Amino acid sequence: MAPKRSRRSNRRAGSRAAATSLVYDTCYATLTERATTSFQRQSFPTLKGMGDRAFQVVSFTIQGVSAAPLMYNARLYNPGDTDSVHATGVQLMGTVPRTVRLTPRVGQNNWFFGNTEEAETILAIDGLVSAKGANAPSNTVVVTGCFRLAPSELQSQ
């Protein structure tokens, strides 16, 4: 008679690590020609309300619409970096809404600490050249960020 096999359990013994959660947050901005619009933690209402929880950028979706064509470039930053780590390249915004997705490259997706300075830039969008020149109407962008939040147990003290 063959020995009896025990059933294996997929459950781990002991405590499990706290899971991270994904949060989508949206903010609105106006781009102007030859100017940079910066987005910080305080720009996103949900991140601002999370207190000192650390977060990681998963992706940004930028949707822009403008009465006159406007070229722009979006840049993504890592914590503490003064130079961008990834960019969309030159994009064109016009009367038809266009969506561009910006994700960090592998190895460049670092955590922003919970006590991130209010002035630390996460995303910057440069308005480059408009077809109307100085008389260009406002150019609206909707920026939706997907962020990974650290577990609340790991909040900064």
UniProtKB/Swiss-Prot annotation:
Superkingdom, natural source: Viruses
Subcellular localization, as worded in the UniProt entry: Virion
First-listed, main subcellular location of the protein, grouped into a coarse class: virion
UniProt keyword terms in alphabetical order: Capsid protein, Virion
Pfam families: Potex_coat (PF06184)
Molecular functions per Gene Ontology: structural molecule activity
GO cellular component: viral capsid
Gene3D superfamilies given in the database record: Satellite virus coat domain (2.60.120.220)
Protein name, UniProt field: Coat protein
Organism: Satellite St. Augustine decline virus
Lineage of the species this protein comes from: Viruses, Riboviria, Papanivirus, Panicum papanivirus 1
